[in-house]
Amino acid sequence: CCTIFVEDDGTRTMCTFLGAGTLISPEDIHPEHITSHKIAYLEGYLWDNQNAKMAMKKMVDICKSDNQQIAFTLSDLFCVDRHRESFKELIENDIDILFANEDEIKAQCQTDSFDKAVDYAKSLNMIVAITRSENGSVVVNKNEVIEINPVQVDRVVDTTGAGDLYAAGFLFGVAKNKDLSTCGHYASIAAAEIISHYGARPLVKLSNLV
């Protein structure tokens, strides 16, 4: 569960309790539930618990043995500070698609410069999607850098879930074999929907928006 305070400008402060998420263990990960899908999506939050971390590593091994894509989100700035070295090893060895906001990616490569963070993303030789709030997002794939414009909304009501819905829209595009620019546009559409109202669940079927 999560207690969220939302300001008038839509920014929010969260106090998160992971609850049952901390009880996930390797025994809960069944190959047949994973290999029937195209992409696995892992949350950095789960690195806060050793059992959950081992469960995610088991999922990574299953995906790699089945040649599945693995997506990973850095989740939170403080999460990066706690697990930077573990994340570094995971990113460099196992991940195909990385999601982060601007502050998280800068923290991961320990720089205050966004340009240097983009250079770091280029060096990873994978797809890296970096969200930048009202400045849209940047998708990096090796030396290719694609700037994605934000989808405008009448009013930003609540930014809770914006990063999650961005990832959902992006991965929807990847699963549909769309080019990275289109994936980024889908991501922006999904994020725009979620920030236009209170709560982190969409009020419409997202596939109807793209």
What are the residue ranges of the model-derived segments?
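Ribokinase/PfkB-type carbohydrate-kinase core domain
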Residues: V6-I146
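Conserved phosphate-binding/catalytic region of the ribokinase-like
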Residues: A55, D61-S65, E85, Q110-V210
